[in-house]
């Protein structure tokens, strides 16, 4: 991998990680459109450490409170009803599905799931799902001619059942094209949560899974002779810087705007990919990067 490739891919990772458009799909597509090797699942996982570092800094106050309260709840039973302590436990609960499925489906994630036809299908299907969830939330928030606006749930209403459903939505994002934020936020909207609440839990929930995946892949990469460490680490730093700017913008965006621009973008991109693969312009199976 060249330094220019790492710069571009780092920017792509940072720009798309927190948007409901699938960062793994865009890394895969950027390489395919540019004629580069597929950067692979390991590169994606390692550079995601950079974007999750942006989450840690952006939500540092929330995370600090959650960790402190959760730690105290281990020895003080009265703390187990504290909202921050509960959030810590619910992040753990929500991380179980992706932990189990990530280890079980590791070979598929690194191989068959990276087929561009699957990526395109997921972009379209999940795009439609996000659109339905967005319209449902907008209808509740605005009400209608014969119905009053509906009060949507806050994170204080989050329980084990909802946490597990969020976790299953996150696990679906193991398939390129789904989008971690798109799947979890739309899942939250379907369960009746406010947009900001759904997004906040989505980003907090991603921290253990992404960091664990990144460390796991980092361990394997350190034992490999086929990793371009300089460019990979450079891409991770670029992803961190870009990701921080995007997450700050996105949290403001979702409070007042619809997800429909992302929905139409996903559907259009999915259709373009299917057409280009069908006419032979793009190969559905790109070669893995050799370094």
From Swiss-Prot:
Q: Does the keyword Metal-binding apply?
A: no
Q: Which keywords are on file for this protein?
A: Antibiotic resistance, Cell membrane, Cell shape, Cell wall biogenesis/degradation, Hydrolase, Membrane, Peptidoglycan synthesis, Transmembrane, Transmembrane helix
Query: Where does the sequence pass through the membrane?
Result: 39-59, 85-105, 118-138, 198-218, 231-251, 262-282
Q: Which Pfam families match?
A: BacA
Q: Which domain of life is it from?
A: Bacteria
Coiled-coil positions: none
Q: GO biological process annotations for this chain's record? A: cell wall organization; peptidoglycan biosynthetic process; peptidoglycan metabolic process; regulation of cell shape; response to antibiotic
Coarse class of the protein's main subcellular location: membrane
An MF annotation (GO) of this entry: undecaprenyl-diphosphatase activity
Mode of membrane association: Multi-pass membrane protein
The record's annotation in PANTHER family points to:
UNDECAPRENYL-DIPHOSPHATASE
Recorded protein name is: Undecaprenyl-diphosphatase 2
